[in-house]
Amino acid sequence: MTEQLLVAIAAESIREDLVDALISLESVSGFSLATIDGYSRSHSEYDLKEQVAGYRRLCRLEVLHRPDQQATLLQALQAVCEASPVRYWITPVTEGGHLGGTSPI
């Protein structure tokens, strides 16, 4: 069965809630979470500091999962995202593996 990659961009304010939601799922063996700077032509929801800087501090979440885990994963994230909308996309993974060494990351 092929795997998929869920990528979600969320406000930093719900970062810990996202972590809690994913850790609670038995089917999720791990995920990546990074702080990013999000740029947009729509500045209407930026605060003054963000408008001056030209970007908003966000977090990027990545979860490698099987297609049959997708609904459960999205349901868990939906519960966290009620107050702060999250943009996401899911793409198929055509190849993956480990390079170098004998221990996976």
What is the role of each PLM region?
Residues 1-105:
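Positively charged, small/polar-rich N-terminal and surface patches that mediate targeting and assembly
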